[in-house]
Amino acid sequence: PVIIFPEGTRTQPGTHRPYHPGIAALYSQCDAPVIPVALNSGLFWGRRSYAKQSGTIIIEFLPPLPTDMKRRDFMQRLETQIESTAERLALEGADRYPLTRPALVQNRDTNEASPSTGPAVD
């Protein structure tokens, strides 16, 4: 298996980074299903941070995406599934680990103030 973070880096929960189109190129060339994976690790290990907080990282494997999708549809579905699940996992984690909640709320407020550019596709 190949594991790829389509954003190209870790992201803080509640923030959005455009997905890189390389995953769509691999998808179109490999004729293999893509299994989206969402996690809440950003609650405990922030982007550009060496400091880590104690907590349990939750990883959720989502249903495989079929191999016959158009590139734009694939990117949109991949991003929608990962982001919505990651947000749910982050909220659940913040409920269990209250110290992570302020960063989550701050990131969500900042993200809502600047509109998303949507997935990076060509």
Give short role names for the model-derived ranges.
Residues 1-122:
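Non-catalytic C-terminal accessory region of glycerolipid acyltransferases
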